[in-house]
């Protein structure tokens, strides 16, 4: 496997793996660690953002053009690499500009996960509660007893047991929400079950989910962009730098410079580590690399091995349809954003483009 190497980091990895080798809930290999180096944060309300150069970082600039060419060939619109919070690379392709907005697609699930965590921190909900506590009885076609067994955590972990074989798996109308499995016994990437989290937050806080998310995250870290309803989906649209701001927030475990956005570190750890034993490569709506097995959207199959063999083991990611990418590499204080068109597979989350992209990134950044 290709990965970043540094003598001190190698020593840390040896110590970590000597103490833990399972993929169960609470596995902390992927937890972003703000202590690995000082992070820079761009000012809120300003376009100012400090930069650093590949040369200053000792990266292989002879591999930079190959990375650019791949991104251009695969329909990329915006691409940013942050190292220690500073911009190393910021590229826009075709007619797309720094001011243009783009859908995050399912990479926006990471925003929802943090919003739920903030609502819990503020005492509006508990993810261990039944969803019925916030949605009321009869939100689905299940019996009251079956509804009572589905918790908010099950929605965060894709384990509600709702029937994903319905005609429209995005539909969250009552008639579309049928029983298939006991909650917590089966993992499937079911978008309707995820989107219901918006209703849960709205009911729990008394504030519309979109507004609550803006107030608690977007506005406080200088993002722009909006949640837009498209069919049954609530999709977040923003410019590329706004996605990078959110990635930087997550790289620092929910703290923006000296401002706590999500101060509940227990929730943050649960969000960014294995959340259940059915798909060790999934946290609370975040994808996790370096695990022994994974499942993929649209498939019931369990695949042996990690998500992206060429990516760092501690990578965590927000992944959206048509290859929207938010990558965090905590061990290197590295954050990467890719927004654009489908790179060839039309996948809802992970795709072969991830590994191809990491081959070029490894050559540029260093293995």
Language-model regions: role of each:
Residues 98-99, 161-238:
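Catalytic-site signature segments of enzymes, centered on catalytic residues
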Residues 8-16:
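Bacterial N-terminal signal peptides
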Residues 1-8:
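Bacterial N-terminal signal peptides that target proteins for export
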Residues 122-158, 207-239:
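Active-site helix/loop module of the DD-peptidase/beta-lactamase fold
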Residues 85, 102-128, 155, 196-201, ...:
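Active-site SXXK
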